[in-house]
């Protein structure tokens, strides 16, 4: 392809903003003795924890340097055994996610939002392994290359009902990847 892959490291403070009223965020580092040490980019990840048992975990990722092109969007999740809360680690329940993407329209002046994974189509994340989830593809009508402020955002949130006990609300995220779509 004529354009390159974009990789957004989840643990970097400038790459994301969690919803403060529902979500607590932690940047975590893997121990060198962890079997996943060489499989996780930068040996670190973002842990998002709900503020309460009824909170829906939610975060926005800033995405810079998109070109006017089509990308496949992927999110790399880590296994639940890495969760700081040992009850979450022990239960090892899957995440169910919803994903939206917002970006500038063709005129470059207004933000459009697209549901990559809508609520009714929530995607299950495997809690037992590193799971690279392909959440869909998107075509950006304008380039944001070299813009100082990220106008492209990926919104990731828990897709479950309040108080649901069979789905994990704790997200362990390595990175977000936008790969050039293969034609």
Short names for language-model regions:
Residues 1-183:
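Extracytoplasmic
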């Amino acid at each position: 392809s004529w354009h390159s892959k974009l990789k957004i490291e989840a643990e970097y403070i400038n790459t994301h903003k969690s919803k403060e009223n529902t979500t607590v965020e932690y940047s975590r580092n893997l121990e060198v003795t962890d079997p996943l040490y060489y499989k996780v980019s930068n040996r670190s990840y973002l842990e998002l924890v709900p503020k309460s048992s009824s909170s829906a975990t939610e975060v926005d990722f800033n995405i810079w340097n998109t070109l006017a092109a089509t990308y496949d969007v992927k999110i790399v999740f880590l296994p639940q055994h890495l969760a700081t809360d040992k009850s979450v680690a022990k239960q090892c329940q899957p995440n169910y996610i919803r994903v939206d993407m917002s970006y500038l329209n063709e005129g470059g002046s207004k933000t459009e939002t697209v549901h990559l994974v809508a609520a009714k189509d929530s995607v299950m994340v495997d809690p037992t392994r590193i799971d690279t989830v392909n959440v869909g593809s998107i075509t950006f009508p304008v380039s944001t290359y070299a813009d100082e402020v990220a106008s492209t955002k990926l919104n990731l949130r828990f897709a479950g009902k309040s108080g649901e006990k069979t789905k994990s609300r704790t997200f362990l995220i390595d990175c977000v990847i936008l790969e050039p779509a293969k034609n």
